[in-house]
Curated annotation (Swiss-Prot):
It comes from Enterobacter sp. (strain 638). One of its GO terms (biological process) is L-methionine salvage from S-adenosylmethionine. Homodimer. This is 5'-methylthioadenosine/S-adenosylhomocysteine nucleosidase. The lineage of its organism: Bacteria, Pseudomonadati, Pseudomonadota, Gammaproteobacteria, Enterobacterales. Keywords: Amino-acid biosynthesis, Hydrolase, Methionine biosynthesis.
Length: 232
């Protein structure tokens, strides 16, 4: 099995990259792909860049060049579920765009023409992630993760997301674009991220302060998940 892992920022991939044995780097289209073995398992780690276009471009390059069997999207996210705090884990059962609006033509809010309203994560990957969470004794929430090209740190943006997606557990800027590409390529995916802020008016400050905490937690989680998937 070859496992694809995608993070947007240097801080979100550096700890994993440092663990890759026989690491080789491919720079392409503004992205970097690191290939090798993580604890003996073939992996391809992508640093995509921030935002939906960068994530979609990177995910497409990763799938075309490296042919991974599954995709794990890792990194940080803003917490929306009331029980979440910095360092907690969120696992997607679905991903949706929070900034797409074609409702004038009868589509659901967040749905693009020709696409499902939401992109469902793979049940087996979700189950494996939840098993890892129990094994590591981490605080975690599973549910809807929403994505858009905005860092949410104000009451207006937050209120709009809560109105349109009252069940959303977290918000970030890449996951749904990655899920969209995986859907088009029929490759199973799951989003496993750690909370860096709680998407409020101080989130830009807490993000800077706690990004390292989120990166460490998500790295531990992803490394454990890779090992579990490799064992079957």
């Amino acid at each position: 099995m070859k496992i694809g892992i995608i993070g947007a920022m240097e801080e979100e991939v550096t700890l994993l990259r440092d663990k890759i044995e026989n690491c080789q780097t491919l720079s392409l289209g503004g992205c970097e792909i690191y290939t090798g073995q993580l604890n003996g398992t073939d992996v391809a780690l992508l640093k995509s860049g921030i935002g939906k276009v960068a994530a979609a471009l990177g995910a497409t390059l990763l799938l075309e060049r490296c042919k991974p069997d599954v995709i794990i999207n890792t990194g940080s996210a803003g917490g929306l579920a009331p029980s979440l705090k910095v360092g907690d884990i969120v696992v997607s059962d679905e991903a949706r765009y929070h900034d797409a609006d074609v409702t004038a033509f009868g589509y659901e809010y967040g749905q693009l023409p020709g696409c499902p309203a939401g992109f469902k994560a793979d049940d087996n990957l979700i189950a494996a992630a939840e098993s890892c969470i129990a094994e590591l004794n981490l605080n975690a929430v599973r549910g809807l993760i929403v994505s858009g090209d905005a860092f949410i740190n104000g009451s207006v943006g937050l209120a709009k997301i809560r109105h349109n997606f009252p069940n959303a557990i977290a918000v970030e800027m890449e996951a749904t674009a990655i899920a969209h590409v995986c859907h088009n390529f029929s490759v199973p995916f799951v989003v496993v991220r750690a909370i860096s802020d709680v998407a409020d008016q101080q989130s830009h400050l807490s993000f800077d302060e706690f990004l390292a905490v989120a990166a460490k937690q998500s790295t531990i989680m992803v490394e454990t998940l890779v090992q579990k998937l490799a064992r079957g």
